Amino acid sequence: MPFTLGQRWISDTESELGLGTVVAVDARTVTLLFPSTGENRLYARSDSPVTRVMFNPGDTITSHDGWQMQVEEVKEENGLLTYIGTRLDTEESGVALREVFLDSKLVFSKPQDRLFAGQIDRMDRFALRYRARKYSSEQFRMPYSGLRGQRTSLIPHQLNIAHDVGRRHAPRVLLADEVGLGKTIEAGMILHQQLLSGAAERVLIIVPETLQHQWLVEMLRRFNLRFALFDDERYAEAQHDAYNPFDTEQLVICSLDFARRSKQRLEHLCEAEWDLLVVDEAHHLVWSEDAPSREYQAIEQLAEHVPGVLLLTATPEQLGMESHFARLRLLDPNRFHDFAQFVEEQKNYRPVADAVAMLLAGNKLSNDELNMLGEMIGEQDIEPLLQAANSDSEDAQSARQELVSMLMDRHGTSRVLFRNTRNGVKGFPKRELHTIKLPLPTQYQTAIKVSGIMGARKSAEDRARDMLYPERIYQEFEGDNATWWNFDPRVEWLMGYLTSHRSQKVLVICAKAATALQLEQVLREREGIRAAVFHEGMSIIERDRAAAWFAEEDTGAQVLLCSEIGSEGRNFQFASHMVMFDLPFNPDLLEQRIGRLDRIGQAHDIQIHVPYLEKTAQSVLVRWYHEGLDAFEHTCPTGRTIYDSVYNDLINYLASPDQTEGFDDLIKNCREQHEALKAQLEQGRDRLLEIHSNGGEKAQALAESIEEQDDDTNLIAFAMNLLDIIGINQDDRGDNMIVLTPSDHMLVPDFPGLSEDGITITFDREVALAREDAQFITWEHPLIRNGLDLILSGDTGSSTISLLKNKALPVGTLLVELIYVVEAQAPKQLQLNRFLPPTPVRMLLDKNGNNLAAQVEFETFNRQLNAVNRHTGSKLVNAVQQDVHAILQLGEAQIEKSARALIDAARNEADEKLSAELSRLEALRAVNPNIRDDELTAIESNRQQVMESLDQAGWRLDALRLIVVTHQ
């Protein structure tokens, strides 16, 4: 290998050193100085792992002074090169630059430059890069993108709402499903879609203080969305980092109280340029035309500044008409400005609901009914569709569905309001109550008496709360170490129940964390019962581990002991037995407890066991909940209303449980009120809205389609290959779970989403739902997305050499495999990937420019090839460099036709879809005022920008592989 002082070479094994200069040569060795790092390397002359850097006419090079030059001619004299060309900054021509003055920080980014500079990748990395390009492009084109990656059951009505709303520009909707139907999940799905597609980047979630942690957990566990929780302390800290503290995070959760307490804070929130605002428990925002509450005004102010708004609320019937109108007014104050007009409009929807019911019933329609439908829809050329719907043909059902969709598009608040009821959704279990009346121990009786004397000045509410938890009254006098569990009959009953039901998973809920911890100790020490604890003092990871231990079938915990707050947001539908060691103070909390098990997908009836002490507030409350509200065995939408109406009386009975006079009458009155309110709610149900929200067969098909995609084996093979190449250790744990841990030889020292301790993953949705410690891996999971980004944003796998052993071809035959990418640059919010994601075009060219890609499939061809080490590869490249240059030019001449075809197809699809959506909404705007002007403007603007971006689309060479035929 001829070396001359001043020549420039690059290391094949340490390309990060940059461009080296030959500074010493003797008979056996050569020394290179790498100026960009200041390091020297000594190599054997005969077999050194370095490649001569030689540029060609047309290349752009940089001098050590920083100016650039386009090479037009290359001269060699005494082994040293001089480049002649035109400077790009001054446009001076005929400039000469000797190679010794080349910039030492040279980085080869183009695949062909890397190949000619000896930066040759392993063959498996090239294959991974091509697969990453191919799968990434396919995923953008898959239907239901953004709906597949969440750790949730595939429940049709939830998917239907999320699919509809998640694709809109800046959606402003009211989610008003009944309790237990998953409003939080629906909101999370919508957020996930909007964030994944780029339609939104900044999200603010405002919730009651007690639900902050629940939302934090749900967003992270189900959707892999890491929100920051802002309270007074975090807000004060962030003020050091930015003028507006909320600019320090993209995804934020805070409480309603935190938002409204300070004028400056609310101003900062309004100025933070959020894309989406989510408000949970929005029915607590009190409004009247004359006196809106401060909370309502705070959200109203925010809703004016944030383009997208999701309000999660109780059902409209529970709210009452005026309160329901107030929520809609937050979404669109221009449309909902007059309450009286709104009431009148609602009455007019009855005939539409009747028409929809008539179509869904499937009966033949009379001429009058057909005419009425025609008038309601108000479309020209509707006659053939009406005739098809009324015929006996196979198309009748689909024609009726289309008519139903048209009716719902044109009438009612179905674009802004979604509401599902348990009546309309299948899959809920029964609930069976078992009450166990137990005697009040003398120790508690004494403590209660003393407490009554000493706490005479306490309010009735404080006394009532004390009376619910006699063990705490006892501890107040005897100290925290008082062993109340030695005589409390509930503990004896619980141990007996658990030992006689050892095969059952049992969820035990109590109000306080201390109670849960003490019970765990007693169960473990006395009976050897495996019990996990779950309370608010534990970190999210500790709670995950406890939940995972409880979920394990054979070796897991039999019991999970939860505190009230600690269990928020967690669901354990694999268990069906629940013990309430004490009772919560209001019906909402009771429903929240039962809701841990009473979910869609629960396979068994729920057994609710309530051991209670007689002559305590527990005995009062158990009767009131069961006999007055029927709140144990059925969901109780009336609970809060009745609770508020009898609050003072109920508190007095709880504070003095031995004073039972009149209590039977209270229960009777509550039951009558409950039945009357329930009938009223049932009567006020908006059937039209239910049909729209539920999604029917369309929603079912959506769930089935995603279920099919869950079985994609390509994902598993690709993910394992990706993790191998990144350098992540994989340990099969069984039960469809794999443990991933970082290694010492990773492509990057710190891979996003992989902690030092490692993570457990699964590709199985059912396993992920049962095991909260296992992350559910899909194409949408950050682990895969970060991996794709790591490979595709760098040059990993962009140039390689392979040998093809094939005696049918002459030795030394050259083939060049080219991977071009056709793409368009545009802001993420345009969601251009719907039409033209970065799309790979593969070409396999011989020296005559014949493209063999169609005849030779990638994976089949890849299996026939053998790898070449980098040093041998560099020698091969140097030997055939001119031939490869010629083939590359042939490739450049051919790619334009293929790329143009892709770009034209994308333009046609974008124009057709976006124009059709705009036309549809413009036509509907004439008959349905719930379509906002700003939505139409945004779609038109989006269409124009998308078309302009596609006009600017281009292509580039992303990767290449040189293939040399051998017979050995």
Curated annotation (Swiss-Prot):
The alphabetized UniProt keywords are: Activator, ATP-binding, DNA-binding, Helicase, Hydrolase, Nucleotide-binding, Transcription, Transcription regulation
Q: Which CDD domains match?
A: DEXDc_RapA, SF2_C_SNF
**Motif DEAH box residues?**
280-283
Q: Does the keyword Protein transport apply?
A: no
Q: List the disulfide bonds.
A: none
- Highest taxon in the source lineage: Bacteria
- Tell me where in this chain the Helicase C-terminal domain is found: 490-662
Provide the assembly information: Interacts with the RNAP. Has a higher affinity for the core RNAP than for the holoenzyme. Its ATPase activity is stimulated by binding to RNAP.
The entry's protein name is RNA polymerase-associated protein RapA
Source organism of this protein record: Shigella boydii serotype 18 (strain CDC 3083-94 / BS512)
Its ancestry begins with: Bacteria, Pseudomonadati, Pseudomonadota, Gammaproteobacteria, Enterobacterales
Which gene is this protein's source? rapA
